[in-house]
Amino acid sequence: MGCRKITLGSDDSVQEDYSNRNMKNHHGGVLLKGGHLYGYSDGRGWTCQNLKTGEVVWDSKKLGKGCIFYADNRLYCMDEGSGTVVLASADTKGWKEHGRFKLEPQTELRKPAGRIWTHPVVSNGVLYLRDQELLFAFDVKK
């Protein structure tokens, strides 16, 4: 498990540019911004990876494994275990946190070892988060 970058030629040829374990994403997704991938990599933590070279630009374990969303030059990252949500910069200089909070209350439907696998969504300046039957809306307009 890991990541691989391939290039498709005009003659339908395939060239492998790299294959490594720098971004081992599970279900949290990754996003591409300015030639860099952002996401959670198992064992490494939150990671910024150069798409062209495959090299890790930075990594951080300041938040547990989870999902990611991008809006207004910010990363919305949510820890799937604790429900902690972090607003961070989409920046190649490192993990820059602008705030965090814990999603509460949390569902009673989820088993104790269960996870929150829904992705954050921002629409019209409102951040939407869901945990089973619970839906949360936060005003995140500038």
Language-model segments: residues:
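Noncatalytic, solvent-exposed loop/strand surfaces
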Residues: 1-142
